[in-house]
Design a protein with these regions (language model features):
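Glycine-rich adenosyl-binding loop in Rossmann-like folds that engage adenosine-containing cofactors
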Residues: 1-45
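Conserved acidic-Pro-Pro-aromatic motif
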Residues: 37-133
Length: 133
């Protein structure tokens, strides 16, 4: 069975990580894999909601979904964790360029994020992005 430092870090859990992750500066084995973008699929119906939980690959997924985001303007629920990627700010800025507003849910209310700050509360990892229409 394949075992990596990532499994050690997460006590047996295995997921993908971005090569520029911030997990205690540990080194990991890398593998080339074929990827498909969401834009490469032909969807027959309107897409109203997309959930993204890709352990640091959020920015790549969004870039590969640009046509869908522009055409359908779906609501996005994205798990973003600073320890998995250095592209957190780029992710927020990219969606802002596409006219998305960002929010987080504090357990009671939906709170609008006016701008991404490096010191954004780290206990919030699930962010909601809604297109301005």
């Amino acid at each position: 069975m394949f075992k990596s430092n990532f499994e050690d870090y997460y006590e047996g859990g295995l997921a993908t990580i971005e090569s520029d992750n911030n997990l205690n500066n540990k080194k990991f084995d890398t593998f080339d894999v074929k990827k498909l973008t969401l834009d490469s699929f032909n969807f027959d119906q309107k897409i109203g909601f997309i959930k993204i939980d890709v352990e640091g690959h959020e920015f790549s997924v969004l870039k590969g979904s640009k046509k869908i985001l522009k055409k359908y303007k779906p609501v996005l629920l994205i798990e973003i964790d600073k320890q998995h990627s250095s592209k957190v700010k780029e992710t927020f800025n990219y969606l802002k360029e596409l006219r998305y507003e960002s929010f987080y849910f504090d357990g009671i209310d939906l709170i609008k994020i006016l701008s991404y700050e490096e010191n954004i509360r780290t206990d919030f990892k699930n962010f909601i992005f809604k297109h301005k229409e």
